[in-house]
Amino acid sequence: MKYGFVKVASAIPAVKVADSKFNSQQIDALIAIADGKGVQIIVFPELCITGYSCADLFGQTLLLEEAEMALMQIMNNTRQMNIISIVGMPVASHSSRMNAAVVIQKGKIWGVVPKSYLPDHKES
């Protein structure tokens, strides 16, 4: 922190729909660049680990498992960095699935925030 300010960045990774491994590699690279530039908090788009337009695939256990593995890989690859990263991914909770922002730093999950408003895409 310099002069009481926190350096924050937003990043938009290249994303392939339902390719969590590719997406996590893109996210890793952007986190490393931001960390090298002294960024303290980096924010990514919602569902950036899986891609936003997976539609029916969000109901598949395999996609959720791959997203979780991708998150673990990001956490492992950024374990030595001080940067706080906020990434979007689908999360299973009991019998429901949520679109959530996951806050991570130094290989730990600090919070999971579910999206509170889900558009129905029939709105004008």
Which sequence ranges carry the predicted segments?
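Hydrophobic structural segments
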Residues: 1-124
